[in-house]
Amino acid sequence: MQWSYRFVSGLLVLASIVGMTFALYLEHFKGLEPCPLCIFQRVGLMAMGIVALIAFLHNPVSNAFKRVYAFLATLGILWSVGVAIRHVWLQTLPPDQVPSCGPGLNYLLDALPLKTVLQQVLQGSGECAAIHWTFLGQSLPVWSLAYFSLILLVCVWQLLRRYPVIVTKKK
């Protein structure tokens, strides 16, 4: 069975919606406050979802457009994978090597230039190293990394797969 570009784009949109719904459920119904790294992971997931939604709605005929959309979606989810790797690494540090907790993301965005905020958040803080939720013995960042990695595989497949050449007749 050949999956159409539009079908796979729709699956990526659905994956983004499911991921964001679960994150918001944990935040608003289970009381888990997202740390700055969690928020950055959400940004990448939403970026991938928005690009996939545009690709789904546009349903490009041109292979060039298909590749551009797939590349942009891959960049978005790659951001989430990278931040999740950093998050998991912070959680595996010995307690004496965990960075101290800094101010919240809202304060940083209000008080500092964006470049400085990005540097500080990606450095991580003590709140990012704390494990507040586990499932089957793994923390939320580990599960997020697994989910994002699966989405990344689909995005890379969408980017690299062969598309049938559509020949149009000249009038």
Swiss-Prot record:
Name of the coding gene: dsbB
Localization terms from the record: Cell inner membrane
Stretches assigned to the Cytoplasmic side: 1-8, 61-67, 162-171
Name listed for the protein in its UniProt record: Disulfide bond formation protein B
Gene Ontology annotations for the cellular component aspect, listed alphabetically: plasma membrane
TM region positions: 9-25, 44-60, 68-85, 143-161
Family: Belongs to the DsbB family.
Topological relation to the membrane, as annotated: Multi-pass membrane protein
GO MF assignments: electron transfer activity; protein-disulfide reductase activity
Disulfide-linked positions: 35-38, 101-128
Record topology, Periplasmic segments: 26-43, 86-142
Gene Ontology biological-process entries: protein folding
Keywords: Cell inner membrane, Cell membrane, Chaperone, Disulfide bond, Electron transport, Membrane, Oxidoreductase, Redox-active center, Transmembrane, Transmembrane helix, Transport
Pfam families listed in its UniProt record: DsbB
HAMAP family assigned: DsbB
